[in-house]
Amino acid sequence: MSDVAAPEFRTLDEFEYGSVEQVTPLIRRVIANNPSKFTYHGTGTYLVGHGDVVVIDPGPNLDSHRDALAAALAGERVRAILVTHCHADHSPLAAWMRAEFDAPTFAYGPHPPPDPAMEPPPDASEDDDGASGEPVRIEESTDFDFAPDQAVVDGDVVVSGGGLTMRAVHTPGHTSNHTCWTLDEESTLFSGDHVMGWSTTVVSPPDGDMSAYIDSLRKVAGRGDAVLWPTHGPQRDDASSYVSALVDHRLAREAAVLAQVRAGRTTAPEIVEVLYAGVRAELHKPAARSVWGHLVKLVDDGELVVVGGDLPTLGARFIAT
């Protein structure tokens, strides 16, 4: 294992799938039964407000989660559905919820089309079965069917009145369309997958962009939110210091990746074998994707080039300039 220290992560130890947990006076959470190496215990869908409700990240297409949300929202009106990004553990149930509650969807935009030249081939090892027994294609699967009713830009006020004020905060990096959502009344940022309390975030090219991700982390660190509520894992009530630590961690990881290339390890998997030697083997594939993100950034920064002048794909070889 490298000497790159990780920030202090936290666990979410007490919860029940499908139950409604009142986590603050204005926020409820329902956790989907889709645990995996990407999703931790599962997708946390947030219900904001009472009576007139805003839903954040409806979650995956699981019957059990749909039924839990239907029960949680019985007798209430959904005024808006906010989606952080278009991975399959976040947005698919938006279509059902939109039809069921006649509520508009908001997001930065649809996911851009795939880039066949850069996309790695499908890997069956990235499929997991949730503890529910329902097959789940984990986060790296993309919901290309989702398109919002209303596309937002950074700073848009999407909900106002009824005791709720919510704004869009565009945070590209994990995906190009990733957007966090604020709740002004509780000085809260719903951070999606941009910041997670239990782990670092996978930043996988081509749509994931490490340079944009680090810039977005700095943006969030400077906002002054009191609490972060990620879609996976526990809240962080040390928002600014924790996100600043994530920036430091990413920069240290980048330096370690560059050092490994200079030492003769020229591919993402070779680098992972060293930098993640103490990490469980099943996490090496997602780790390789973030290492790939660092390699692409280092190419863009002029620190590395691709052997043979090829595209900086997951299988490419890199050398220092």
Give the ranges of each region predicted by the language model.
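Metallo-beta-lactamase
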Residues: 53-55, 60-62, 140-150, 164-254
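C-terminal regulatory/interaction regions
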Residues: 1-9, 259-321
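Conserved beta-strand hairpin/beta-sheet module of binuclear metal-dependent hydrolase folds
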Residues: 14-76, 180-192, 197
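Short, structured coil segments at secondary-structure junctions
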Residues: 23, 100-101, 224
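Histidine-centered divalent metal-coordination motifs
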Residues: 84-90, 174, 232, 294
